[in-house]
């Protein structure tokens, strides 16, 4: 199974984290009252109300995550949803789409960092329900300022417009992190000027998570 097939095999297109390498997602058959069905780990996790964000945050991934959040709310609006995160970050607008949906749906969203939650993914980690933002002990959290994804060309006025948008995005991110952590906007602004790496303990002290897990 190649990377494209693996991505298609996962529910909602949620493929494994990291570059598009060959990766086999195990599947097996289960017998039900309706007959035999083929399942994979992502299906089983979803049935347990677990969403696994193990890729860069793209528009397609955001759509898949939002669909799962809305579907799980429709199935039971009172049961907690868990979101496991191992992501290098990605699109800011894709992140805000997930962020707003997390705040829109009725169930509490538990967030758990496995490995890394960087950039946009760190904001999603911190956006979980208070008291339910968790991390495994050796995970890493990275926060930093938004950046342009590619070289910018064009007229000076166009570049000025883009700069204004980046500053707007930065202020929005600062407010999101300040709300989640209890840190002042001024402190957040200072800290994200450069890459700020945090251990699980450092993320807890900073207010990005609430506790460190020793087992799941």
From Swiss-Prot:
GO cellular component: cytoplasm; endopeptidase Clp complex
Recorded superkingdom: Bacteria
GO biological process: protein quality control for misfolded or incompletely synthesized proteins
Active site (catalytic residues): 119, 144
Disulfide bond residue pairs: none
Signal peptide: none
EC number: 3.4.21.92
Residue stretches in coiled coil: none
Any one GO molecular-function label of the UniProt entry: ATP-dependent peptidase activity
Localization per record: Cytoplasm
UniProt keyword list: Cytoplasm, Hydrolase, Protease, Serine protease
Keyword Transcription: no
Catalyzed reactions per annotation: Hydrolysis of proteins to small peptides in the presence of ATP and magnesium. alpha-casein is the usual test substrate. In the absence of ATP, only oligopeptides shorter than five residues are hydrolyzed (such as succinyl-Leu-Tyr-|-NHMec, and Leu-Tyr-Leu-|-Tyr-Trp, in which cleavage of the -Tyr-|-Leu- and -Tyr-|-Trp bonds also occurs)
Assembly, per entry: Fourteen ClpP subunits assemble into 2 heptameric rings which stack back to back to give a disk-like structure with a central cavity, resembling the structure of eukaryotic proteasomes.
Function as written in the Swiss-Prot or TrEMBL entry: Cleaves peptides in various proteins in a process that requires ATP hydrolysis. Has a chymotrypsin-like activity. Plays a major role in the degradation of misfolded proteins.
PANTHER family hit by this protein: ATP-DEPENDENT CLP PROTEASE PROTEOLYTIC SUBUNIT, ATP-DEPENDENT CLP PROTEASE PROTEOLYTIC SUBUNIT-LIKE-RELATED
UniProt similarity note: Belongs to the peptidase S14 family.
Name of the molecule in the record: ATP-dependent Clp protease proteolytic subunit 1
Organism encoding this protein: Cutibacterium acnes (strain DSM 16379 / KPA171202) (Propionibacterium acnes)
